[in-house]
Every structure is written in structure tokens, then in C-alpha cells.
């Protein structure tokens, strides 16, 4: 298993002139597969952050009973999800391939989603497995991004 090593480089900027949405609207057409994720926890403002993720390096998706790894060297691996090799094994195997060091490296993780249909991998609940040509999104998709813009609304700063 090949190990991918990365080191973070960060810069802090004053964030009171920019909003996550306005910044995302400026960069979304330049960087395909970009993502905007905003905090919805309004109880503790010290942890209220928004993220814009740009330029995917690698991804892991779970779909139709198969884990698919897309790695930084453009290789692709497929692993069937079974009782012996579960979703959590696939996610841990994928995550273990990456080592990120440096300031704010704790932000460099996997960003993505888990759809409702992913319940079939964790509980004994039947879910209709449909394949649609127009919208066949994976049940789970998590991406490691090259660039992150982190908005800390509590401190009015951008990383």
C-alpha cells in the first residue's frame, strides 16, 4: 500500500469582508468538484466554521456494494463490501494511505456525504438498488481536497 505524504501551508487573512457564499460563488466555476460546507450549530459560536474545499486529490465512494478508491497517482481500486470487508474497513484503509503534517493539519480530512441509502451497509434494512443514468450518485462519497478555505466567524478570519 502506497503512502501519500502532505505538508500544510497556511495563511491567515481578515475575513470580515468576505462571506463563505460570496467566496464560493467566485471559485466554483474555476475549480470543478468544489464544495461549500457551513456549520449549522448556532449554540456554540467558538466552533462555528465554514469550509470551501477545492481541487480534489483523492476520493473514496461506496456504491452498489463496492468501495472505489481514486488515488492521487490517478490509480483506481475497487473492493467489494462484504461481511468481512465492511464500509468502515474501506474508509479506514483509504484514510490510512494519507499522512498530513503541519499547522492546521487537523482540517485536512475527508469531506463529503452519506446518503440515506447507505443505511443498508450498517443495518439490516432493505433499500432498492436503482441505477439511473441521469443521477446515479454514490451512497457515500468522501474527498480529500488540496485546498481548503476555512472561515472562522467567531474571530472574523479566513485560513
What are these regions (language model features)?
Residues 1-159:
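Signature of the chorismate-utilizing enzyme
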Amino acid at each position: 500500500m502506497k503512502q501519500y505524504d502532505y505538508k500544510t501551508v497556511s495563511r491567515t487573512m481578515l475575513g470580515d469582508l468576505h462571506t463563505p457564499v460570496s467566496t464560493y460563488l467566485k471559485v466554483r466555476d474555476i475549480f470543478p468538484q468544489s464544495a461549500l460546507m457551513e456549520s449549522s450549530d448556532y449554540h456554540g459560536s467558538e466552533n462555528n466554521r465554514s469550509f470551501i474545499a477545492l481541487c480534489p486529490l483523492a476520493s473514496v465512494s461506496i456504491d452498489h456494494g463496492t468501495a472505489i478508491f481514486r488515488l492521487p497517482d490517478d490509480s483506481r481500486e475497487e473492493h467489494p463490501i462484504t461481511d468481512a470487508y465492511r464500509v468502515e474497513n474501506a474508509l479506514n484503509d483509504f484514510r490510512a494511505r494519507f499522512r498530513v503534517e503541519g499547522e492546521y493539519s487537523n482540517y485536512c480530512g475527508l469531506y463529503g456525504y452519506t446518503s440515506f441509502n447507505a443505511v443498508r451497509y450498517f443495518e439490516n434494512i432493505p433499500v432498492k438498488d436503482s441505477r439511473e443514468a441521469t443521477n446515479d450518485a454514490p451512497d457515500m462519497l468522501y474527498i480529500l481536497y488540496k485546498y481548503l478555505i476555512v472561515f472562522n466567524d467567531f474571530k472574523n478570519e479566513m485560513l
